[in-house]
């Protein structure tokens, strides 16, 4: 198989946009080259660490009890037992709407 590396045209193009030539970039850099094995190890280590963090958050999230939802359910049951949410009908009451008839005359 072929050697892994950047494409022949992409790296000089990116360096030209940045104002460097390929020769200048290699001369000015006093760092060692990173082998593909080291790079793959860094990427795989990052993936494993990310998965471990996600699993830890998930497992700790399942351990925490959901008290808020349980309190709401018991509170709703308590209200339902003590009083009705609806007012009982008491027949026809004209005194409730009698004020509306007097106010209607002012708007005509």
UniProtKB/Swiss-Prot annotation:
- Chain ranges of the ITAM domain: 75-103
Where it sits in the cell: the answer is: Cell membrane
Which residue intervals are topologically Cytoplasmic? 58-108
> Which tissues is this protein detected in according to the database?
Highly expressed in spleen, liver and thymus. Weakly expressed in lymph nodes. Expressed in peripheral blood leukocytes, granulocytes, macrophages, and monocytes. LPS does not increase expression in granulocytes.
Q: What processes in GO biological process is this protein linked to?
A: actin cytoskeleton organization; amyloid-beta clearance; apoptotic cell clearance; cellular response to amyloid-beta; forebrain development; integrin-mediated signaling pathway; microglial cell activation involved in immune response; natural killer cell mediated immunity
Per the UniProt topology annotation, the Extracellular ranges are 26-36
Query: Keywords of this protein's UniProt record, alphabetized?
Result: Calcium, Cell membrane, Disulfide bond, Immunity, Membrane, Metal-binding, Phosphoprotein, Signal, Transmembrane, Transmembrane helix
Cellular component aspect of the GO annotation? cell surface; plasma membrane
Supply one GO molecular-function term: protein homodimerization activity
Superkingdom, taxonomy of origin:
Eukaryota
Stated membrane topology is: Single-pass type I membrane protein
| Binding site residues for Ca(2+) | 46
Can you summarize the PTM annotation of this record? Answer: Following ligand binding by associated receptors, tyrosine phosphorylated in the ITAM domain which leads to activation of additional tyrosine kinases and subsequent cell activation.
Q: What does this protein do?
A: Adapter protein which non-covalently associates with activating receptors found on the surface of a variety of immune cells to mediate signaling and cell activation following ligand binding by the receptors. TYROBP is tyrosine-phosphorylated in the ITAM domain following ligand binding by the associated receptors which leads to activation of additional tyrosine kinases and subsequent cell activation. Also has an inhibitory role in some cells. Non-covalently associates with activating receptors of the CD300 family to mediate cell activation.
Q: How does it assemble?
A: Homodimer; disulfide-linked. Homotrimer; disulfide-linked. Homotetramer; disulfide-linked. Homotrimers and homotetramers form when low levels of partner receptors are available and is competitive with assembly with interacting receptors. They may represent alternative oligomerization states or may be intermediates in the receptor assembly process. Binding of a metal cation aids in homooligomerization through coordination of the metal ion by the subunits of the oligomer. Interacts with TREM1. Interacts with TREM2. Interacts with CLECSF5. Interacts with CD300LB and CD300C2.
Q: What is this protein called?
A: TYRO protein tyrosine kinase-binding protein
What organism is this sequence from?
Answer: Sus scrofa
